[in-house]
Amino acid sequence: MLKEVRPAVVSLLALTMITGLAYPLAVTGLATVLFPYQAQGSLVERGGKVVGSALIGQEFKGDEYFHGRPSATVAPDPADSSKTVSAPYNAANSGGSNLGPTSKALADRLSEDVAKLKAENPAAPIPVDLVTTSGSGLDPDISPEGALFQVPRVAKARGVTEEQIRKLVGASIEQPLGGVLGESRVNVLKLNLALDAAAPR
């Protein structure tokens, strides 16, 4: 009996060591050597202090900042653990709203967002990414059009010219990888940090 069981036990232990220990350590070690910034979570620092990650969006409020996409993430309701409450950019509970096109809640939210954006910049068409959530609810980027749409509000709140803010947006645009993969985008956290440095409140 021991003779028959021994190969299975040895195989189990060997594969556990290879796939559960050696392989993850090797991949982590290589990533840390070859891509140290990404391996540590693409953390963004300011004045030696971590203020966020380039890969995870965060909520910015106030007219003086650029805003990201709407986030549909939720968190447990402190008053009733069987329910949830809205918690934008909750990285512990990534996901979309799963609301369909016939959902009244989705239609109401879209109408409210569109009305707010039209009041902010009546003459410009509203970029779709400013009213739609991403699949993860944690998207750190917006389109260049989404950033440019917000320029008048930000410039007015900061007391600077729109041209100054447009130049900042232009300098913050990240191109598709290799010119073909993905779309042009603006990282909201990095743009707001550049904004604070160039035009302090």
From Swiss-Prot:
What GO cellular component entries does it have?
plasma membrane
Any keyword Hydrolase?
no
* Signal peptide bounds: none
Q: Does the keyword Membrane apply?
A: yes
UniProt xrefs under InterPro entries: KdpC
Report the membrane topology from the UniProt record: Single-pass membrane protein
Alphabetized, the UniProt keywords read: ATP-binding, Cell inner membrane, Cell membrane, Ion transport, Membrane, Nucleotide-binding, Potassium, Potassium transport, Transmembrane, Transmembrane helix, Transport
Q: Where is this region: Disordered?
A: 69-102
Q: What are the transmembrane regions?
A: 12-34
User: Localized where?
Assistant: Cell inner membrane
Comp. bias intervals (Polar residues): 81-101
Q: Could you cite one Gene Ontology molecular function of this protein?
A: P-type potassium transmembrane transporter activity
Q: Which family does it belong to?
A: Belongs to the KdpC family.
Q: How does it assemble?
A: The system is composed of three essential subunits: KdpA, KdpB and KdpC.
Task: Report the protein's function.
Answer: Part of the high-affinity ATP-driven potassium transport (or Kdp) system, which catalyzes the hydrolysis of ATP coupled with the electrogenic transport of potassium into the cytoplasm. This subunit acts as a catalytic chaperone that increases the ATP-binding affinity of the ATP-hydrolyzing subunit KdpB by the formation of a transient KdpB/KdpC/ATP ternary complex.
Record-given protein name: Potassium-transporting ATPase KdpC subunit
Please give the organism: Rhodopseudomonas palustris (strain TIE-1)
